[in-house]
């Protein structure tokens, strides 16, 4: 939640801005840390800017080893996506970053909620996202990541073709799909192509939960090309596609 800050909030913690973002974790270990501290805590994200967000303790070590004093490992995250950011300094309140708390859920609590138009399209000089985490290609793997949108089997056939081409040329290549669509690739992709299912289309929270881990796993195997399917934008799917679109640098091919 973004509020106008009072004088008790140091500007060092807000990047010099007159607003402050307040967030509350739902993990019992994080809540225990806050309770023991007995003070307000400045809590930047536990990853380097531009890297996929951490969902495991080892991801934090990969990014922050030698940069911080301690890591408290609470196990795998419960949701897999960063928090929804909502600006309550404006009327009506505005979503600056979609997350697991969806617009539909917010509307059950407050009548009107808008979405920052800049997060729906590729950033331009005249339309830039207000939230720092929404900048161009922020949630990005090292590989050239392309997504394909269209009828499922048609998309799979195109991905099989381009993935096999890249693999035959000697590139380390990966594919992102779902449990329901994984069968399209079985026996049709080269042995060197790594096919990863993000989860169950009927349970989009499973896709959200595995998204960043999959991107980091591709980084570890030094993938040079990743080809992925798009997903429904319904409910939490909006946040999933927001992260994937940015990870792909808005490189979505419509079939």
What residues fall within each predicted segment?
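Active-site-adjacent structural elements in enzyme catalytic cores
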Residues: 1-255
